[in-house]
Curated annotation (Swiss-Prot):
Record-given protein name: Translation initiation factor IF-3
HAMAP family per record: IF_3 (MF_00080)
Gene3D superfamilies: Translation initiation factor 3 (IF-3), C-terminal domain (3.30.110.10), Translation initiation factor 3 (IF-3), N-terminal domain (3.10.20.80)
Subcellular localization: Cytoplasm
Top-level taxonomy: Bacteria, Pseudomonadati, Pseudomonadota, Gammaproteobacteria, Alteromonadales
């Protein structure tokens, strides 16, 4: 199924002009002033005289509320408002960085730089330490590594969860960015 322009499909369709079925309507004129209850014909004539549309704003009211306005401009303003609201919402993602107990200093610094980038962008970070083979016997190395990461990032992030034991063959620590003031 093919759709039209993105964003216009979800907008609630208001009935305009001839689509309105009520005999009487509560009218709001082009200046936003109450014009009282009018017959649909009179309201339509007033809208035509002004060169704009008669738009049903509240169809469930008794009688329905209609407004004289430029419908195209109304839709444009509504979609602009929705776009602004979407822009203000930030989707928080969880970024994962994997370490090993034997992660070398150079690799550690690169991974730490990436973690800083994620946290500064406002994303949460998941630090995973994976153990292989005999490394399982030295879980304290994993704890030391997590504590080192925690210390290096303490000005940027707070620890949400710190592992107190190994889950399977890995340890997982979650960090969230510190709220900016």
């Amino acid at each position: 199924m093919r759709g039209g322009k993105k964003g216009q499909q979800t907008a609630q369709k208001n009935r305009i002009n001839e689509e309105i079925t009520a005999q009487e309507v509560r009218l709001i004129d082009i200046d936003g002033e109450q014009a009282g209850i009018q017959s649909l014909k009179d309201a339509q004539t007033m809208a035509d005289a002004a060169g704009v549309d008669l738009v049903e704003i509240s169809p469930n009211a008794e009688p329905p509320v209609c407004r004289i306005m430029d419908y195209g401009k109304f839709i444009f303003e509504k979609s602009k408002e929705l776009k602004e609201q979407k822009k203000k919402q930030k989707q928080i993602q969880i970024k994962e960085i994997k370490f090993r107990p034997g992660t070398d200093e150079g690799d550690y610094q690169v991974k730490l730089r990436n973690l800083r980038k994620f946290l500064e962008a406002g994303d949460k970070a998941k630090i995973t330490i994976r153990f292989r083979g005999r490394e399982m016997a030295h879980q304290e190395i994993g704890i030391e590594l997590l504590n080192r990461i925690k210390g290096d990032l303490e000005e940027l992030a707070v620890v949400e969860s710190f592992p107190n034991r190994v889950e399977g063959r890995q340890m997982v620590m979650m960090m969230a960015p510190v709220a900016k003031k």
